[in-house]
Every structure is written in C-alpha cells, then in structure tokens.
C-alpha cells in the first residue's frame, strides 16, 4: 500500500462527532480545574492548513492539548479538523483506533504535511516528552532539544506556522529532573526513551513516571501568536536553522511576557 494511501486512511479516522462529545464532556472540567485562558485565536488563519508549534507542559498528563483543542473548536467549530501529533505509544493496541478518531496522528512528517495540505490544522510539540518533563525551575525556557522537523513540514506543505506558548503546566507538580543520565545508563534508548523523569506531587510523593500524581489546579494560560509565512519572511530557499531560531525566539519572548504577568506559582 502506498504511503499517500496510508496517510489518507490515518486522517480519515477523525470523527468530529466523537471529538465533540469528548470536548463537551472533558473540556469544561479541565477549563475550570486549570482556570484556563487561551488567547490570540482572533489572529489565527481563518481557513486552510496551519501548523501550530507549541511548548509542551505537564508531564504525562499534558493538559495543554485538551485546553487548546477546546478553545479552537469553540471558535472554529468541528468542520475544521485539529490534528495533534502523538508519540508512537499512543497507537498501540486498542488505543490506536480511539486516538485516530479524536484527531491524534503519528508524529510523522509525511502524515502531518498531508493533513496540512488538505486544510487541516496540525498541533505539534517539537520538544515532546523532553519538553513536557522539563524541570519546574526552568519551566519558562523554550527547548525543542534541537528538533527542527516541524520547519520542514511547514515548508513541504506550504503552510504558515502559528507559534503558541503556554505557562503554568509545569506547576501541576514539581518536576525535579528529566533523568537523562540515568536513562542513558539503563540503556532506555532501546525503548525509544531518552529520559527517566523524577517528579514530586500529590498523593504519591516522589514518582518516576508512575505512579502518576494528580495535577494541582494550576492556572494555565496559552497564547497563540501571529502566523508566520516562511516564504514571505525567509524567501524561497529558507535555511531550516534560521527559521527554527526565529520561531523559538518569538516564542521565548512571548513566554517571558507571560512569566512577567504571572504573580504566584499555581495561583497564577
């Protein structure tokens, strides 16, 4: 079977009715618990494909996905699909079918580019779990761990990049360390993991991924920034590194601004 057909089948799994039911059920709960605010959607492209590039927070829970999706669908409705790139572990066993139906697709450049070309909006967290488990004491640092594939995806699909930043998710518990050195010693790279994070939270206290602690009701604010047309800003043959540096710089400036507005940990 050809790759385009595989890509099409993966995108075709999206079920707007199921997605709406999930968002309607879980969205208000998450919004109240995290006192969520999503800003800047008024400048979001009104139609067509767009690649939303965001920092990732909250460890295993990563509430930023649900919070952004709920705000996105409130504004644009369910005629416009929002796909989120996910780790391969989400597509194993019975989870695979459910993942596709609510818009999760594999973190694969070809699949993402096809979604963008068909007019879908794609949400990507280039830093992945490396970012979502960053220490709380460095929570306001945009760190993609050198990953630049998102830039190539946007260029291949001729889609604008919409940078987005969120703050507060790393206060849902105390993220102590990614545990990269320990993961290396234990040879976890064979299992496609470069980290073995240590966190402190409620009710289990210290946790190494499991048992999963409950998230504190930290206030999470997400800011969508102005869309960036890569060709218009960087020309027809942009340097991937230059684009990545610029995107992260724009995001870091916005995250610094949100950090200055935040008065207290957890409370916001």
Which stretches of residues belong to each language-model region?
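Catalytic core of membrane glycerolipid acyltransferases/transacylases, capturing the structured
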Residues: 46-112, 118, 128-145
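Pocket-edge structural micro-motifs
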Residues: 40, 54, 70, 86, ...
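Hydrophobic alpha-helical segments of integral membrane proteins
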Residues: 22-29, 95-98
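Helix-to-loop junction immediately C-terminal to a conserved catalytic motif
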Residues: 25-56
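A generic local structural motif
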Residues: 36-39, 71, 109-110, 209
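Non-catalytic C-terminal accessory region of glycerolipid acyltransferases
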Residues: 1-22, 114-268
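Short, well-ordered coil/turn elements that cap or connect secondary structure elements
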Residues: 31-33, 79, 156
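Hydrophobic pocket-lining residues within nucleotide cofactor-binding pockets
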Residues: 44, 57, 90, 166, ...
């Amino acid at each position: 079977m050809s790759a385009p057909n595989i890509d099409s089948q993966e995108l075709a799994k999206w079920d707007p009715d199921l997605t709406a039911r999930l968002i309607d059920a879980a969205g208000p709960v998450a919004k109240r618990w995290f006192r969520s605010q999503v800003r800047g959607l008024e400048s979001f492209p009104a139609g067509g494909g767009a690649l939303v590039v965001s920092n990732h927070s909250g460890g295993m829970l990563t509430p930023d996905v649900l919070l952004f999706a709920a705000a996105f669908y409130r504004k644009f409705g369910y005629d416009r699909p929002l796909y989120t790139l996910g780790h391969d572990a989400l597509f194993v066993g019975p989870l695979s079918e459910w993942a596709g139906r609510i818009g999760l697709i594999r973190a694969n450049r070809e699949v993402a580019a096809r979604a963008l070309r068909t007019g879908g909006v794609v949400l990507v967290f280039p830093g992945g779990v490396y970012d979502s488990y960053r220490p709380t004491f460095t929570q306001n640092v945009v760190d993609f761990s050198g990953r630049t594939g998102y830039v190539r995806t946007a260029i291949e699909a001729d889609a604008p990049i919409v940078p987005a930043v969120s703050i507060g998710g790393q206060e849902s518990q105390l993220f102590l360390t990614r545990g990269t050195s320990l993961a290396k010693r234990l040879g976890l790279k064979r299992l496609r993991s470069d980290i073995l994070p240590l966190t402190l939270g409620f009710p289990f206290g210290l946790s190494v991924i499991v048992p999963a602690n409950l998230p504190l009701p930290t206030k999470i604010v997400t800011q969508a920034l102005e869309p960036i047309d890569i060709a218009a800003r960087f020309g027809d043959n942009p340097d991937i590194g230059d684009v990545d540096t610029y995107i992260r710089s724009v995001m870091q400036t916005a995250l610094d601004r949100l950090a200055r507005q935040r008065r207290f940990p957890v409370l916001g």
